[in-house]
Amino acid sequence: MSTRARTVVAAAVLVSLAGAPSAGAAFDAGVAAGEVTSTTAKVWTRADRAGTVTVRIGTRASRLRRAGRAPARATHDDTVTIDLKRLKPDRRYFYRFVQGSQRSEVGRFRTAPRPSARKTIRFAWTGDADAQPATAGGPPFWNRFEVYGRMARERNAFNVNMGDTIYSDSEVGATHADGAFVPAAPPALTLADKWAKYRQNLGQAALRRLRASGAFFSHWDDHEFINDFSQAENGTELYAAGVQAFRDYAPVRYSSQDGLYRSFRWGRNLEVFFLDERSFRSAKATAGGVCNNPQTGAPDLAPTAPQATRNVFAALIPSFAQPVAPACLAAIGDPNRTMLGARQLDRFTRAIQRSKATFKVVMNEVPIQQFYALPYDRWEGYAAERTRLLTFLRDNVDNVIFLTTDDHANFVNDARLQTLEDGGPVDSGIVDITTGPAATKSFAKEIDDATGVADGGLLITRAFFKPAPPNGVGMTCASPDTFSYGQVQVTAQRLTVRLKDANGNAVVDAGTGQPCAPIVLDRE
């Protein structure tokens, strides 16, 4: 890491080179460097018109050389991604784009260390960000992406924007009718509409700063397409629009065969695996109405919870008094249903078993820990494959951890094979840490809406998520109403995760009222 003096000088050079805001007006969506390895990177920008865009790069901000060019085309909303090769490991690079007389701001990133290098790595992740205003022309409804701004100030080796990087169907003004999410505005279903959503989010300076500040990994979840997306339920046309829009605005490695599955090595201590949990999944178990609760006519809110547990909460949620249809439970447990698809599951399990990195981090779109509420879109809704995966990792791979977003909450727990079922808890020994959101409705407020009970989300957190089995699921941290992110530090002997709010402070546990303690994984 640079000394403080060198950092100040470098920052001053960046400011002077970037010039006044008007100097970069042609590149007003900013710049980004993605998929960074020890020798390669993908750099991104958006021009204001079609034509050739050139990228210049160097190890000093004051001396940038031409490194590649690509056309900005209207068919890709004038976005440009250029591959950089033959970079040096663990080296800081500066880059900027040029089109005619127009210059972008200067971005920067550091390449990954060599796989053999013993180096401490620090990174952060969050997701779930929506800049939709309440009224046209107004400010974003949720916030101005302060979480992203705080992440940029942390000077991490890299940052991860982990899913729901736009909201094709915004929760601003949305309602819940019979347990179903109903957006207030028409969803963005076309390519052009999705482009507009990405431009809307990039209108926030904090996100642009984060993308320009260092290596930036992007990943999708469902809202890049539509809520709870699967091709089986929502079709290939919507998938194609979502894929192109995402690739146009995020410098990522994608193929039709493997989707967004990929992995990156950051020195001897760390390998990061990104699972694609949208491209190949089966339809949810709710298809055909087999999980509809007879009292509400909508999908049951906790079909896999034991009936004894449901009875405890029936006063709060009367539909829990109704038994769950056996066909629903059979669908959830169907071994033929998949989250990852056979090819990806095989590639991932082989790769993580072969990995020579000390710690293996799995970037995970939806929680794999068990907490029963609304399980259909999560790993719990694909129970057989969840069990197979966790059993394999438990038996074959050391030092694994799941880092997750999607549920708009901070939830930390062992990804148990079972929790409240007959026979009692069975730990996997693998922790799942869920964080966020950056800027959308929190889990607590979503539960309020789904149940129609004021503060129902906090009540369920305190009465069920926090207590240890058999009275609850025993989360070690549960903060369901905080804009947040997670920061990870990896050394040769220890991986440490700290969950932080938009001010950089530890998130507060809703059960204890105290800051959530760091999560520590010591090397086995």
Language-model segment annotations:
Residues 3-4, 17, 37:
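Residues at the start of alpha-helices and the adjacent loop-to-helix junctions
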Residues 25-524:
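Metal-dependent phosphoester/phosphodiester hydrolase catalytic core
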